[in-house]
Amino acid sequence: MTENTKDTPESETGWRCAVCGFLFSGERPPRSCPRCGSPGAEFLPAGDHTVFRYDGEPFDVLLINGSSHRVGNTGFMLDCAAEELNARGVSFRRYNLSEYSIEHCWCCYSVKAEYCTYPCRNWQDDMPGFHALLATAKAVIVASPINWNNMPGRLKDFLDRTTCMQNLFHLDKPGLTEGKVVGILVCGHEDGALKTALDIFLYFQQMGYILAPFGIGYRTHGAEFNSSTDSGFFRNDQRVREDIKGVVSNVVEFMQLDIESQLKGRLAPVSE
């Protein structure tokens, strides 16, 4: 049962808010979501969900937007990152986690280490596709907002689900991510940026990723301002663009050293 219960004429389309799931019928999305207030750009055509799987085409850098909002400030940071990658001729793929179905980790490891297998036992959602992307990409750049001095729950679910990749050495299998490069971008209204970045990095560190030199970029606005002004601040602040360009450049330079190949088979995995 949808919340917009009027009959849908043939000329109208169903739209779903990617943030809260509100369903709307009309020729175009509403200007803002009646339930969560998100702008109309957050709406996607409604329809049956197709399980996401990696198509196997090679690429270099994986861009992950961990925010609930596809087109908010975190999305803007990835816009800037994508712009720099394009300028450098580096292939990449970009994903907004809010568009995908990623369930909570089942915590099989807590029952017995060997029960946490790869591929993941939960193959019914979209995460197996992301596991394959992580195994393929030479580098990852994660962009995150700040929620209560930490990453949002959506991103944490995504990172929790990488446990099966970190756990490969318990199964006497070779790692798939050791020596890859990671960069982290964080934005928020107030404080908690560096803590958020380090919390994110901890997951990647345990998978064998190497943080690019100067690989963390962050910016906050300020508690004295209304959060409605954050968008204009980030988009008009030259420092934001320069820092993102720097992080992306550092990730690419480090990635192109091909340290992953140099370290292959030489690292000793250590559990957290």
Residue ranges and their predicted role:
Residues 2-3, 21-22, 35-37, 45-172, ...:
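N-terminal beta1-alpha1-beta2 submodule of the flavodoxin-like/Rossmannoid cofactor-binding fold
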Residues 11-13, 29, 98-101, 178:
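Short metal-coordination and nucleic-acid-contact micro-motifs, chiefly zinc-binding Cys/His arrays
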Residues 16, 32, 104:
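The −1 position to Zn-ligating cysteines in a subset of zinc-ribbon hairpins
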Residues 17-26:
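Short Cys/His-rich zinc-binding micro-motifs
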Residues 28-39:
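Cysteine-rich micro-motifs
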Residues 97-103, 174-176, 207-230:
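Mobile beta-alpha loop/short-helix "lid" or hinge segments that flank ligand
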Residues 171-217:
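Short, glycine-/small-residue-rich phosphate/pyrophosphate-handling segment
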